[in-house]
Amino acid sequence: MDDPKIMNIMNGMKSLEDHCQLISDVKDESPMQMFYKDKGVFLTGGTGFFGKIIIEKLLRVTEVGQIYLLIRTKKGKDAFARIEDLFNDPVFAKMKQVNPKYRCQITIISGDCSLPGLGISADERETIMENVNIVLHSAATVRFDEKLKMAIAINVHGTKEIIKLAKEIVNLKALVHVSTAFAHCNMRHIQERFYSGTMSGENAFKLSECLDEHTLNTLTPTIIKGYPNTYTFTKVLAENVVQQSAQNLPVTIFRPGIVITTYREPVTGWIDNMYGPCGVIVGIGSGVLRVFTGDMDNKAHIVPVDMCVNALLASAWDIARNKYETPPIYNYVPDAENMVTWRRYMEDGFEYGCDIPMRKSIWYPRFTIVPHMWQYHILCFLYHTLPALVMDAIMVIIGKKPRMMKIYRKIHKLSNVLKYFSSNEFRFDNDNVRKLTEKLDDRDKRLFAFDMRDLDWTNLFRVSLYGLRLYVVKDDPSNIPESIKRYERLKVLHYTTLAVFYALAAWALYALLKLFL
């Protein structure tokens, strides 16, 4: 791989991963390490993207006593089977080298945030009450189109059950509720404070209990009016539950922006999903997504997951040390001193994606961004629907299963989800996050770095593209030279096809003019 563009990416990754060496060079225990040492941490959402990094960080950098993981049965796999899958993820490789006996620090709690009492047995509940010191509640249904009844059960009632459990814990030091920076997206300026919603969390739960699912689905647009989806609506309700029910607890609310790949640790560019803007980049890189809508000059409030987790862990440390009149709220978003636009994200993603193209791309990557929906629908038909129908027809003729229209339905669904956030401009206050940064000593600033003012966006976008290719698309780095050759062939095919199309269009126009003139 002697290509200078590829070497730039690899060198950028090397410089970022050197940060992990700096972490290992910290010899004396830092204040945050001492805080987590021998503590019992109860974590919800541990099998998710965000939760994996929380677990990895605690096991690799701190001497945490025990992590109690609330895990539900899913797709026929119980909690114990799912934990095996969890630790097979490559994101834990470095942690396993540093802490080979990590399994001794993991206790599985079978349960479900949507169930009464979290579905936890009496014995396990007693274990939590006696041994847990820190509660990190990150579990949520993040599906924007989730049915309202289920979204309320998990995001709202689940939060109420967590608070109820936290009140029973004998030696609780900190409770962190993970919300989202876009919970209050019905407003354009979002401060680090509580806001009142259209109804209380308690009333929303009562409403979902007394109405059947069909009726609730019918009424959903009216109930969530002012919010783009059930996810943001129920996140507002969950914050209301914290405000009303957890005032006497050492509690804080952590609101991350749009979370993307890791920046530096434990490995650069790691991700395990295609949600949000990362899915858009994969769609463009694979040659499938060719048109997108939004105001590309709006700010992109994206944050790397490793820095986000560091800030969350620091918020728990801070609430355990200080008493506040009202629960502190942290908007963890890019700092005003160091922000990028959606245009920068999309264009850089496209540029770096062309440097290391995907081996399984179905066409030469090209994309167009339009601000108006009428433009978007016209171009979607021309660039997405029409080619998909042709390709599916060919697949049927040769006896294979058509799949392009199914793919495009998913893509259009993703585009519809993101257009609200890319078309509207949001401004966030982050004074509490800045103050939290200043409370860290030099050791913790290295061990738990989360100052977004220090982020190098160019490096982040480069390693993100590499990570998406490696961890999501499953393209091995060794096939990059082969992929570049294929990319060049697709480029020739693309422009040849365009030339033929325009030639035929010109001929047809000439024939029509000749016929009528």
UniProtKB/Swiss-Prot annotation:
Cleaved signal peptide residues: none
Keyword terms, alphabetized: Cell membrane, Lipid biosynthesis, Lipid metabolism, Membrane, NADP, Oxidoreductase, Transmembrane, Transmembrane helix
Residues that span the membrane, as ranges: 378-398, 492-512
Cellular compartments annotated: Apical cell membrane
A GO cellular component annotation in the UniProt record: apical part of cell
GO biological process: liquid clearance, open tracheal system; long-chain fatty-acyl-CoA metabolic process; lumen formation, open tracheal system
Matching InterPro entries: FAR, FAR_C, Far_NAD-bd, NAD(P)-bd_dom_sf
Listed GO MF terms: alcohol-forming long-chain fatty acyl-CoA reductase activity; alcohol-forming very long-chain fatty acyl-CoA reductase activity
Observed phenotype of the null mutant: Tracheal morphogenesis in embryos is grossly normal. The tracheal tubes fail to fill with gas during the final stages of maturation, and instead remain full of fluid. The hydrophobic outer cuticle layer of the trachea appears to be disrupted and forms membranous structures extending into the tracheal lumen.
Reaction equations catalysed: a long-chain fatty acyl-CoA + 2 NADPH + 2 H(+) = a long-chain primary fatty alcohol + 2 NADP(+) + CoA
Pfam families: NAD_binding_4, Sterile
Membrane topology label: Multi-pass membrane protein
Group of enzyme by EC: oxidoreductase
Cysteines engaged in disulfide bonds, as pairs: none
EC number: 1.2.1.84
Similarity comment: family membership: Belongs to the fatty acyl-CoA reductase family.
PANTHER family linked: FATTY ACYL-COA REDUCTASE-RELATED, MALE STERILITY PROTEIN 2-RELATED
Function statement: Catalyzes the reduction of saturated fatty acyl-CoA to fatty alcohols. The preferred substrates are C24:0 and C26:0. Necessary for the final stages of tracheal maturation, to facilitate the transition from water-filled to gas-filled tubes. May help to maintain the integrity of the outer hydrophobic envelope of the trachea.
Protein name: Fatty acyl-CoA reductase wat
Organism of this sequence: Drosophila melanogaster (Fruit fly)
Gene: wat
